[in-house]
Amino acid sequence: MKKTYHGSCHCGGIRFECELDLAEGTSKCNCSICTKTRFWKALVKAEAFRLLEGEYVLVDYQFGANAIHHLFCSRCGMKALGIGDMEELGGKFYAINIACLDDVMEEELAQAPVTYEDGRK
């Protein structure tokens, strides 16, 4: 069942909310940036994401095919989310850093299915 989660970066400069169901699955990728940042994500459709604060502190980083906008806080360095637009994933989406969800319960994290993606190919 979808639930509204609130999230933020470490310093609070970025604040967002999103509608997601962690039971539908999360993922971890082995591409270079996800490996180095230990990014554990949940994908959220564009209409289910709201940036509440922080557009002015977001820094965009892209590499490789420039398919994903990796967004970091310019103050604390936290990678809070990514933005992509891929037909195979249903169009525009937000990749939410699970670690940035402020009101997620430990039980929800323990029960969330994790898919491992091969992002190195």
Segments the model singles out, each with a brief description of its role:
Residues 1-8, 13-121:
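A short Gly-Trp-Pro
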